[in-house]
Amino acid sequence: MKRTLIAGAATMLLAACGGAADAPGKTVQQFMAEDVQPTADIYWGAVRFESVLVDGQPVERDIRPETDEDWARVREAAAKLGEYGTELQRPGYAEGRGEDWMEFAQSLVEVSALAEQAAAQKDIDKVFEVGGTVYSVCKACHDVYPPASGIPGARPGDLETDAAG
């Protein structure tokens, strides 16, 4: 009898934990703004070309990872984007959205694997190219699920930004 009670209590405890694990700690907008976007910016910002004015003169710069630490940061950003794509497929984020939500999130997982591979190979051209594909995946999702559309789980103020920022 004692074993049955212990087993029953353990089963109930595990079931209760399972439900809590599916509930995200952030709205999708918060998750995007606080986690996904900054991580994507790290990847996108790793390889780029800039033309700026310095003392009225144009200065052109190729921005690219130079050290092993730089490349590790790019690779880590790519890996995190893949993890975030997986997270977006969890019921707490996917519930109430269409099947295309799952496809977009899975596309983020897949393109992030390519991004991670490009960074691991320290291939500047490939990092730049795959960055465009990451952008396309993000844009396709945002075209269907606009950030300010009142997606289930959004709260007023989730997307407010500082006008001076």
What positions do the PLM features span?
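Bacterial N-terminal signal peptides that target proteins for export
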Residues: 1-8
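C-terminal motif of bacterial Sec signal peptides marking the signal peptidase cleavage site
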Residues: 14-16
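Sequence context surrounding c-type heme c attachment/ligation sites in exported
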Residues: 18-165
